[in-house]
């Protein structure tokens, strides 16, 4: 069994946009490495790769456009995120394929850029405000991603992809 999730990876342009987000004014944040930036469409937990890939392959998912908000926000006490719109239908399609029953948690599109350090919550906010121009990227494939946890942080590896139409 492997810890898995289904994700949309950001484009190079979106990564550049995320890199430009202001880091000032936030307290107790460990900034995530760029190669971990993604939008989770469905978190699966510990499961079998082959079973999930078989389910995902049945999908017939429509491509979508992810719209990154021009701001950071705290989600729960422990995550600093960029809200993401435009992926609700794609996430619903993925979730229909990979879960036997509807998930208890609704989909809230976001891309995590920071996590809290220790048990203290993230606080503060950027003093430079919103970035003037929002950014979007096309999602033309979804990825099944393995999450390996360690004291240094999570490592994510794509173990399979499915093209969107």
Language-model features: locations:
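Histidine-dependent nucleotide/RNA phosphoesterase domain, centered on the 2H-phosphoesterase fold
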Residues: 1-165
């Amino acid at each position: 069994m492997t810890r898995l999730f289904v994700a949309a990876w950001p484009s190079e342009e979106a990564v550049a946009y995320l890199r430009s987000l202001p880091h000032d004014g936030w307290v107790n944040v460990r900034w995530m490495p760029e190669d971990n930036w993604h939008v989770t469409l469905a978190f699966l937990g510990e499961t079998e790769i082959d079973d999930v890939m078989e389910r995902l392959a049945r999908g017939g998912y429509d491509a979508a456009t992810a719209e990154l908000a021009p701001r950071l926000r705290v989600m729960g006490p422990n995550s600093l995120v960029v809200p993401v719109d435009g992926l609700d239908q794609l996430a619903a399609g993925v979730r229909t394929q990979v879960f036997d029953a509807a998930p208890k948690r609704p989909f809230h599109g976001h891309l995590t850029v920071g996590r809290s350090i220790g048990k203290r919550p993230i606080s503060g906010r950027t003093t430079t405000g919103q970035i003037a121009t929002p950014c979007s990227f096309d999602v033309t494939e979804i990825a099944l991603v393995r999450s390996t946890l360690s004291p240094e942080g999570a490592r994510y590896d794509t173990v399979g992809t499915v093209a969107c139409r």
